[in-house]
């Protein structure tokens, strides 16, 4: 029921609203005036903002507002200004080779910065944000190169990819499956020999036999010293860097059913100048030759 007479709460000393429900009275604590005025001010500001700036969505576009402001247009102006500022460097990158770009400190710095951004968008998904790679994806920070670490060699690999079916200049190599060519004993012997090149093998008595099997079946690609062949994309087996896993069982698995990674050809997607920037960036990571 409503109480027409003012009532002051005995505990708090605050006047009640005059309403009572089941013996419970509501204290009359109005909002502070500054809060009320601030609330009114935000309403007025919101109305002014809606009139001045784009705000109300229509069927095809939002209302433009009396000021005609457009954040999209502002970004367009900033992008145009950035492109204009970079135009000189971009032109020089397009005209010069990767080696010439690296030899020019200003161009090299610009290309490394631009290449790092491109790498994060297009390459980090496989090679990692720090270019350290992972199982099946080469580490680009070290000096272990399948196809060569010179600037133009890196450019060639990025531009045309690895085993990219539609690119006639792609890097290509294929390790045959030895599961039907060698006996399990021979593969075990070969794995023991390969592991002995970088660490103590678990079965040292198999090393000499494995060395002979390696010479007969593997040396034609990996070399008599097992240090690989960049022209063929055959990895160095004597440096303790493993692309598809470490250990004798991983070596045997690769011999039986080889894994062949594929890297897309980036030249059609990114264009020559951007591929050059990527090549300069990868070369700068520490393993470039």
From Swiss-Prot:
Q: Where is the Cytochrome c domain?
A: 110-198, 205-286
Its pathway is: Energy metabolism; oxidative phosphorylation
Its localization reads: Cell inner membrane
What is the first-listed, main subcellular location in coarse terms? membrane
Q: Does the keyword Transmembrane apply?
A: yes
Q: Which GO terms describe its molecular function?
A: electron transfer activity; heme binding; iron ion binding; oxidoreductase activity
Q: Where does heme c 2 bind?
A: 175, 218, 221-222
In terms of InterPro entries, this protein maps to: CcoP_N, CcoP_N_sf, Cyt_c-like_dom, Cyt_c-like_dom_sf, Cyt_C_IC, Cyt_c_oxidase_cbb3_su3, Cytochrome_c_Oxidase_Subunit
Instruction: List the record's Gene Ontology CC terms alphabetically.
Output: plasma membrane
- Coiled coil ranges (UniProt) are none
What assembly does the database describe for this protein? Component of the cbb3-type cytochrome c oxidase at least composed of FixN, FixO, FixQ and FixP.
Q: What is this protein called?
A: Cbb3-type cytochrome c oxidase subunit FixP
Gene assigned in the entry: fixP
